[in-house]
Amino acid sequence: MPVTDRSVPSLLQERADQQPDSTAYTYIDYGSDPKGFADSLTWSQVYSRACIIAEELKLCGLPGDRVAVLAPQGLEYVLAFLGALQAGFIAVPLSTPQYGIHDDRVSAVLQDSKPVAILTTSSVVGDVTKYAASHDGQPAPVVVEVDLLDLDSPRQMPAFSRQHTGAAYLQYTSGSTRTPAGVIVSHTNVIANVTQSMYGYFGDPAKIPTGTVVSWLPLYHDMGLILGICAPLVARRRAVLMSPMSFLRRPARWMQLLATSGRCFSAAPNFAFELAVRRTSDQDMAGLDLRDVVGIVSGSERIHVATVRRFIERFAPYNLSPTAIRPSYGLAEATLYVAAPEAGAAPKTVRFDYEQLTAGQARPCGTDGSVGTELISYGSPDPSSVRIVNPETMVENPPGVVGEIWVHGDHVTMGYWQKPKQTAQVFDAKLVDPAPAAPEGPWLRTGDLGVISDGELFIMGRIKDLLIVDGRNHYPDDIEATIQEITGGRAAAIAVPDDITEQLVAIIEFKRRGSTAEEVMLKLRSVKREVTSAISKSHSLRVADLVLVSPGSIPITTSGKIRRSACVERYRSDGFKRLDVAV
């Protein structure tokens, strides 16, 4: 598919022309009906309503201006996003502000992007209007309630330009290691990345299955936006959507939708696979079959090998194929998708020598009983688009040497909104002494540590999250995975400096269990002993402090990533309310 002369609006018009009566998006509302109330739109309805919203927006500004979308999960969010693009504006997808709580992130993004309009719905307009303030002398954005527009009125569709070669939307990063920045995603980026991912997941274009996209992911998040709105449009698929809250309240709903949507494709972070295993009963799955699930992407956060195994084992009796589970690596700066294992392959893991890994060398464990770290493979990426580079020298690393993952291609986005210096540092990297087949640049510096071993990509974590304890490098994701296998809850491994060096501290969310205070204390002591022993055995590390806290205490981003720097600050200021204070 040529991507240089296509845009999201042109594809939407094409779908409306070629498949006017085919269902495009279905939203299942479990809030109004516990059994799920389904509401659907055809491609012609989506196109006509997006055009009406675009007409309304043209009264607010000019193409290239920003339009924020602050609406609940649902069809109105889909229409608002596509309407902004239809008018040639730059969409800014955001979450709805929490009721009764000032949302600093929403305020910061609106101040940075300076939208001329905010698209919302009547159900939340009271909360949204509070954020419609003027910034730097510019007029306050116009608030448009999408559901109150006459979206069904028959009218001649206006002639919009089919060429939208510039920015489509700003995807604000979750800010796990820095202040959120707006990633500028172009129409070309979207179409290229969806196309790349389809080829990556299914190989031969002729083998790309028709079917349905199933998603509960928030539409303001990069994976939810691409999966729930853009992929159905680019890949000619129907989408079945529900809200994140509907999933969290009853994870079995996700599995039931997968079993009843025919040939379908979905995606979720690691924690969702764990929730589905723990909270989907045999009764929930009675009479259901998952044999038609062609793919479930696991991405957006560190993938735990044990979780993948539990998920496959839990749903094997319902004919879920192991090859349907697709571990994937990506980031917003590359639109979404970067790498995944080859089509038809079940998830593969390799156990690497831990001591060598802390020294930056990836050597598979032998049979000598050495302590190993099990990592999941992300397949064999195209060398022209993915390289492992020494972040200090900018020279490509040989296979087996850990370095920074660099990415190149049409899916690499345009940079950070209004941040030229940061854009140059991250998006315009050049290889020193590149190999004959490698382009010199520009390369995207992902900030992620990875390695190519036996031709396959393995990922360790973020460079900025690297723990240096006793003069050795340690990967917090590995330590957290060890803890979570014991406690089952969220954990944060952080390095806290003392007068001489840095010490390992683990913050562990734990649900108090026990009918008496004495039983609770005994359980907490037992957990601390077990975690301390496991970290010592698996990582050759001494834990300076284990902090047991209630669920929800660890700071996270809007996409669920641990804010480790915030954990350090909170720990040093005694900001965590410890369950183990008397242990």
UniProtKB/Swiss-Prot annotation:
UniProt catalytic activity: holo-[(phenol)carboxyphthiodiolenone synthase] + a long-chain fatty acid + ATP = a long-chain fatty acyl-[(phenol)carboxyphthiodiolenone synthase] + AMP + diphosphate; eicosanoate + holo-[(phenol)carboxyphthiodiolenone synthase] + ATP = icosanoyl-[(phenol)carboxyphthiodiolenone synthase] + AMP + diphosphate; holo-[(phenol)carboxyphthiodiolenone synthase] + docosanoate + ATP = docosanoyl-[(phenol)carboxyphthiodiolenone synthase] + AMP + diphosphate
Zinc recorded as keyword: no
SUPFAM superfamilies, A to Z: Acetyl-CoA synthetase-like (SSF56801)
Keyword Lyase (UniProt): no
Gene Ontology MF term list: adenylyltransferase activity; ligase activity
Keywords: Fatty acid metabolism, Ligase, Lipid metabolism
Gene deletion effect: Disruption of the gene abolishes the production of phthiocerol dimycocerosate (DIM A) and of phthiodiolone dimycocerosate (DIM B). Mutant can still produce mycoside B.
CDD domains recorded: FAAL
GO biological processes: Actinobacterium-type cell wall biogenesis; fatty acid biosynthetic process; lipid biosynthetic process
EC number: 6.2.1.59
UniProt similarity note: Belongs to the ATP-dependent AMP-binding enzyme family.
NCBIfam families listed in its UniProt record: PRK05850.1
Described function: Catalyzes the activation of long-chain fatty acids as acyl-adenylates (acyl-AMP), which are then transferred to the multifunctional polyketide synthase PpsA for further chain extension. Catalyzes the adenylation of the long-chain fatty acids eicosanoate (C20) or docosanoate (C22), and potentially the very-long-chain fatty acid lignocerate (C24). Involved in the biosynthesis of phthiocerol dimycocerosate (DIM A) and phthiodiolone dimycocerosate (DIM B).
Protein's name in the database: Long-chain-fatty-acid--AMP ligase FadD26
Organism lineage: Bacteria, Bacillati, Actinomycetota, Actinomycetes, Mycobacteriales
